[in-house]
């Protein structure tokens, strides 16, 4: 969850969204991070870089969906999956997490594209 107004405006403008605009948000974040302005500028204050990277990945999903309209391009958060990354303290098994990604990958040809799913549920960016 990002409350940085400029970042929200840039990433929320779907029609004008571009790789350059995503880079602008990343560079704004990096500048604020280096200057210790994360909280002041409205960036997440917990697992900050991770959340920004996922937000930008979701924005990039929209770009790819538009660029490659003949394909279904979506992003999926599988949930808090047990993995080496989190010292295996996740809630879901790898199989449970993968199940939802496979479900989204197998959407019909006329299914949604440019969307974000939390597990198998359509979610807002």
Predicted regions: what is each one?
Residues 1-69, 77-78, 88:
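Catalytic loop of short-chain dehydrogenase/reductase
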Residues 55, 75-83, 87-125:
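C-terminal helical subdomain
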Residues 66-70, 107-110:
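Short amphipathic alpha-helical interaction elements and helix-loop-helix interfaces
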